[in-house]
Amino acid sequence: MTPPAALGPVVLDVAGTQLTPDDRRRLCHPLVGMVILFARNFTGPAQLAELCREIHELRDPPLRIAVDHEGGRVQRFRAGFTHIPPMAALGRRWDEDVLDACKVALAAGFVLGAELRARGVDLSFTPVLDLDWGRSAVIGDRALHADPRVVTVLANQLSHGLALAGMANCGKHFPGHGWAAADSHVDVPVDERSFEAILAADAAPYGWMGTGLDAVMPAHVVFPAVDVQPAGFSPRWIREILRGRLGFTGAVFSDDLCMAGARVAGDVVASAQAALAAGCDFVLVCNDSAAADQLLAHLQWRRTPAFDERLARLGPRDGPPAPAQVLQTARYRAALQDLASLGGGPTPAR
């Protein structure tokens, strides 16, 4: 595999369903390493495949393409893709039948990963490892369960399904967004609990998943008992606790630096520098083209061997498979059948 030496730490979005001249200019900047897609970038599977082809052909080695495609209300692509139920449905199945829940979680990961890979998407920011404390509306049914042991087992199964489809995983939102009630898209959530309480519950899956966890996205949540900075800007959380105490060796993605929860660090350049200094490998800048241009003009960054190793671990190991290679296989059909028992099924193409 060609080493990803030409790719940088910035993750940007694009305007629409085709690349504009401004998109191309930004994506060809050496600081950019990845593109994140949203629902506005999608009209159907064929269009998505063509957009991904455009993006991949811009650079050598190709830019990585990511998406938030968890299932439930956070599933960016719908028409022509299988409906993935919210992750809480897997938790409810666990309460009824542990082994069946494990089987369906694996099927969900495989279907999710296979369908994205067949259209050219390289990475989905999933699984959600937040606990369902019944307090956070922005998390809510995105969480698998209230018990961190159950979350770990189901997330491992879902991640195994992703891996079978050739896709890495990304656990979020470290160390946990399930307790703080505020939404970090529009506010700065605060979790006042003790470090011991957070480590024993919310952060536990990040340690228990071990080397099976490829990437992590920290929360824009402040935990005053540990640090006055949100976790995504905190060397204590990322370097000392996530990497040092929990032994995590994969990539760390900041959450979107244009969210309200990230503004405590300053403008987009200051926020990106703070996130990278805290231990993030990649920084996301979404839905603000002026901020993206400002960041590309002023960000100071130095490549390290650790960055290249973590980027390579995210894959993919090769180009996207032809849809027929995956979507007409017996394994895919069996996974669809398993997922249907949870309410998953096809969404009609437009």
Regions found by a protein language model. Name each.
Residues T43-A49, D95-A114, A146-L154, E196-L199:
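Glycine-rich anion/phosphate-binding loops
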Residues H56-P85, A105-L131, V151, A155-P175:
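Glycine-rich, aromatic-flanked loop segments that form ligand/cofactor-binding clefts
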Residues L123-A146, H173-E192:
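Short glycine/serine-rich loop/turn segments
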Residues G8-T20, M87-A107, D187-A200, C258-G266:
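Active-site mouth loops of central-metabolism enzymes
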Residues M1-I65, H69-F81, P346-R350:
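N-terminal hydrophobic targeting/anchoring segments and the immediately downstream early-domain regions
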